[in-house]
A protein has these predicted regions:
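Loop-to-helix junctions at membrane interfaces in multi-pass transport proteins
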Residues: 1, 31, 76-77, 109-255
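Helix-loop-helix module between adjacent transmembrane segments
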Residues: 2-93, 163-171, 263-270
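Residue-level recognition of pore/gate-forming positions within transmembrane alpha-helices
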Residues: 3-7, 47-50, 85-89, 107-111, ...
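Helix-loop junctions at the membrane interface of multi-pass solute transporters
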Residues: 13-20, 27-32, 46, 89-93, ...
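Loop-to-transmembrane helix boundary motifs in multi-pass membrane proteins
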Residues: 36-40, 79-82, 278-307
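Hydrophobic alpha-helical transmembrane segments
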Residues: 40-41, 78-83, 158-162, 253-256, ...
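Membrane-embedded translocation segments of transport machinery
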Residues: 233-266, 270, 287-300
Length: 307
């Protein structure tokens, strides 16, 4: 609910501002509204946060691929990372944002398909239909949506709704990585439509991930699968690959997991790379896109951001 409220605010408040000003980078608004220093601080803050965030996500995915798949083939971790970044750089170098839109669509479809198939195969192994799963006593332990016991509770429902709305406004409406695709729509009407449709799709996908998370815990409890340990600390993020690749559910589930994992990693990294290049060129270097020398500079920036 909080996410939906946040996306409606972004669609009806922030998007019109960006379109009326004809912005390429959303941080140009800071220059018009607050001046050069605020513009520079905003764009540099985005640069640092996005480099760290995208790098960390790609690092996590590379670790999972290395530990559960590529180690068996004797492929070094360094080679895995280099090949991943090189592939992302190659297809964003030529196509730009248009390529990102299409590849993100394909990658997101693969990721959602992986989640749906994972839910199906784990349910099938347990012996449940989906209807039996959502009505089971085991699932009831994980499906409490509205916590109303005490306002002091960390997950009290009003805190979750308000927090979700502000998270969406900050992480979507004020983030070049998330907004760049909306800024390529033909007009503000199309951009609003895209944002609102996306918000409802995201709600459905979030529900699927909640279902998958509950199902993973139920399956691991029933089959005596422990949460993997790293440096003697439990790593719940490794439970999914542990079940998908090592629990004996079949090779198809493992392949589905790997495809979904790669799709998620590439979708995040390629979008971040394009938005970083845009922000550096537009906000920091003030490059004129019509000059031939600027094209060379953009290529150098693209390579630097990849590194």
């Amino acid at each position: 609910i909080g996410y939906l409220i946040g996306y409606l605010i972004v669609a009806n408040l922030l998007l019109p501002i960006y379109y009326n000003l004809g912005l390429t980078s959303i941080y140009e608004y800071l220059y018009d509204r607050f001046g050069k220093k605020s513009h520079l601080v905003g764009s540099i803050s985005f640069l640092i946060s996005r480099v760290l965030g995208a790098s960390f996500r790609l690092y996590l995915v590379a670790i999972v691929l290395q530990e559960f798949v590529l180690d068996d083939f004797g492929i070094p971790y360094e080679i895995t990372v280099i090949i991943s970044i090189l592939l992302i750089w190659l297809y964003t170098r030529r196509g730009g944002i248009k390529t990102i839109v299409w590849t993100d669509t394909i990658q997101t479809t693969l990721m959602i398909l992986a989640v749906v198939l994972s839910i199906h195969y784990i349910n099938k192994d347990i012996g449940w239909t989906f209807a039996e799963f959502v009505t089971s006593s085991e699932f009831q332990e994980f499906n409490k949506i509205f916590v109303t016991d005490s306002i002091m509770e960390r997950s009290y429902f009003l805190k979750s709704i308000i927090g979700g709305a502000f998270i969406t406004i900050c992480m979507t409406g004020l983030d070049q990585d998330m907004m760049q695709k909306n800024l390529t729509c033909k007009n503000i009407k199309e951009a609003k439509k895209n944002m609102i449709v996306f918000s409802f799709i995201l709600t459905a996908v979030t529900f699927l991930f909640i279902v998958l998370g509950a199902l993973l815990y139920i399956y691991s409890n029933q089959n005596g699968i422990n949460i993997p340990l790293v440096d003697n600390s439990p790593r719940t993020d490794l439970l999914f690959p542990e079940i998908a690749l090592r629990s004996g559910l079949g090779g198809f589930l493992g392949i589905t997991f790997i495809l979904g994992l790669i799709a998620a990693a590439y979708s995040s990294a390629d979008s971040a790379l394009t938005s970083l290049t845009t922000s550096v060129c537009v906000d920091i270097l003030k490059i004129d896109s019509n000059k031939s020398s600027s094209k060379r500079t953009r290529k150098y920036v693209h390579v630097l951001m990849s590194a």
